[in-house]
């Protein structure tokens, strides 16, 4: 099938581009192998902030007297907290699906592989491969997590961000390596903010050659120690 524009990836960069292209009169398709909305809506920005909000409300309750309120009893339900987060993510993804339908954008389910000649092979879940062509192909695939060398994710002691977002039981402690702190954000804090505690200890690890902000990148360790 032939399109004016094919967008590979349905994250914030992809679906917004697709909508605008459709509004300008182009025949548009979006290729997505998972849920519409990409990592941001399904596993990153949106659900982590939902978890943070639950943690914030819990923190407010612990300090209710500071606001002139008296709360006799309260507790956290970790399963419900995670369930709320996943529900919000699902709702946002369905919202993107509605926008695709509203703007008459075809959604092609499968894994897309760009080929020469402005062609894309899409492999569906059943293994069937279909070729699509377009005058313009926009790659908006984003990124994926990378395992640390010699430290594979076993799903128990070492977990990825998706597992961290769907834990059935709250861990007593966890460590989140850089560059992104999704693992710790979804439990107790946001990078740069004060801890908002739901319980676990969340130390952060930084790996860098500088101990000053990037704004001062001209400074080296030699300058600092001089």
Regions found by a protein language model. Name each.
Residues 1-11, 172-176:
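Beta1/beta-strand and adjacent pyrophosphate-binding region of the FAD-binding site
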Residues 2-3, 19-26, 31-171:
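Glycine-rich flavin
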Residues 6, 41, 49, 134, ...:
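Hydrophobic residues within membrane-embedded alpha helices
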Residues 8-9, 31, 139, 177:
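Conserved N-terminal Rossmann-fold NAD(P)-binding element of oxidoreductases
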Residues 14:
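N-terminal Rossmann-fold NAD(P) dinucleotide-binding loop
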Residues 161, 173-180, 189:
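Short, compositionally biased segments
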Residues 182-184, 188-191, 195-222, 226:
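Low-acidity, Ser/Thr- and Arg-rich intrinsically disordered low-complexity segments
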């Amino acid at each position: 099938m032939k399109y004016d524009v094919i967008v590979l990836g349905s994250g914030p960069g992809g679906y917004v581009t697709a909508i605008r292209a459709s509004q300008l009169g182009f025949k548009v398709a979006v290729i997505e192998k998972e849920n519409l909305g990409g990592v941001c809506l399904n596993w990153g920005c949106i659900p982590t902030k939902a978890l943070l909000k639950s943690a914030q409300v819990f923190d407010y309750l612990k300090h209710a007297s500071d606001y002139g309120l008296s709360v006799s009893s309260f507790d956290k339900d970790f399963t419900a907290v995670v369930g709320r987060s996943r529900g919000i993510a699902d709702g946002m993804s369905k919202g993107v699906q509605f926008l695709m339908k509203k703007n008459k954008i075809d959604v092609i389910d499968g894994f897309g592989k760009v080929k020469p000649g402005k062609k894309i092979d899409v492999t569906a879940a059943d293994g069937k491969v279909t070729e699509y062509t377009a005058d313009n192909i926009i790659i908006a695939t984003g990124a994926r997590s990378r395992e640390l060398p010699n430290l594979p994710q076993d799903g128990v002691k070492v977990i990825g961000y998706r597992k961290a977002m769907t834990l059935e039981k709250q861990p007593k402690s966890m460590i989140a390596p850089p560059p992104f702190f999704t693992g710790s954000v979804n439990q107790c804090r946001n990078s740069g903010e004060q801890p908002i505690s739901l319980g676990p200890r969340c130390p952060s690890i930084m790996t860098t050659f500088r101990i000053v902000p990037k704004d001062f990148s001209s400074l080296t360790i030699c300058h600092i120690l001089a």
